[in-house]
Amino acid sequence: MEPLILTAAITGAETTRADQPNLPITPEEQAKEAKACFEAGARVIHLHIREDDGRPSQRLDRFQEAISAIREVVPEIIIQISTGGAVGESFDKRLAPLALKPEMATLNAGTLNFGDDIFINHPADIIRLAEAFKQYNVVPEVEVYESGMVDAVARLIKKGIITQNPLHIQFVLGVPGGMSGKPKNLMYMMEHLKEEIPTATWAVAGIGRWHIPTSLIAMVTGGHIRCGFEDNIFYHKGVIAESNAQLVARLARIAKEIGRPLATPEQAREILALNK
């Protein structure tokens, strides 16, 4: 089984300080949190940005400020920017940060109900985004929220629109309106991915109460794991986590106890095909 890659989604676009008082918002706070997460075992930072008042943002100069701040304190970590933005963000603003040419960024594979909103990813926009990844030479992580999106991604590969190989898939399970994080759902998604895109690597982000069940399954079946305040603000039920690093450290400890090594930065880049 290959080494485990832990990703820390430290801020997100929907979580607020009212939900999680320890949420990092400014570039300086994000850099401090990224360093702590790296030291706890994370090798990827999934990055959304905020304005100082907490509003979600896709401003290029703000992204660059956050990226530079993180690079200054932890140059080894992989920074994966979000092209999802906040629900309702214009597609042009979502796409724009690819011009910064990060190592990695997210590509959402379809539309779904997202709580009380609709997270719109029109097929034409998905194709446009996939072409932008190639234009800027950015490695995609494809975000999949239900099984039909695996089929949609497989079709894009067959058409030559997505060419990254191996392709990294992130199962995002437990979003209200999407597939839940029940173990049988994750097991099915794993099998379905193997059938449709056999060379793909995968990770899981279990939202809220599904964080631990999905993480444990991934840990023992060869998948990788995302954690952090974007997905889950609690350490235990009803107990607010002290930091993103606390969530990373728990997964790192469990991995050590079951004998699955954590990936080094070099191994993570190799697994995610960032060196190709």
From Swiss-Prot:
Catalytic activity: (5S)-5-amino-3-oxohexanoate + acetyl-CoA = (3S)-3-aminobutanoyl-CoA + acetoacetate
Superkingdom classification of source: Bacteria
Named cofactor requirement(s): Zn(2+)
Gene: kce
Keyword S-adenosyl-L-methionine: no
Matches recorded under Gene3D superfamilies: Aldolase class I
Quaternary structure note: Homotetramer.
Taxonomic lineage of the native organism: Bacteria, Pseudomonadati, Candidatus Cloacimonadota, Candidatus Cloacimonadia, Candidatus Cloacimonadales
Outcome (variant: D231G): Loss of catalytic activity
Keywords recorded for this protein, A-Z: Metal-binding, Transferase, Zinc
Molecular function GO terms recorded: 3-keto-5-aminohexanoate cleavage activity; metal ion binding
EC nos: 2.3.1.247
Source organism of the structure: Cloacimonas acidaminovorans (strain Evry)
Stated role: Involved in the anaerobic fermentation of lysine. Catalyzes the reversible reaction between 3-keto-5-aminohexanoate (KAH) and acetyl-CoA to form 3-aminobutyryl-CoA and acetoacetate. The reaction involves the deprotonation of KAH, the nucleophilic addition onto acetyl-CoA and the intramolecular transfer of the CoA moiety.
Listed GO biological process terms: L-lysine catabolic process to acetate
Family: Belongs to the BKACE family. Kce subfamily.
Protein name as annotated: 3-keto-5-aminohexanoate cleavage enzyme
InterPro entries reported for this sequence: Aldolase_TIM (IPR013785), BKACE (IPR008567)
Pathway(s) where this gene product acts: Amino-acid degradation; L-lysine degradation via acetate pathway
Signal sequence, renumbered to the chain: none
Pfam families tied to this protein: BKACE (PF05853)
Binding locations of (5S)-5-amino-3-oxohexanoate: E14, S82, G85, T106, N108
Top EC category: transferase
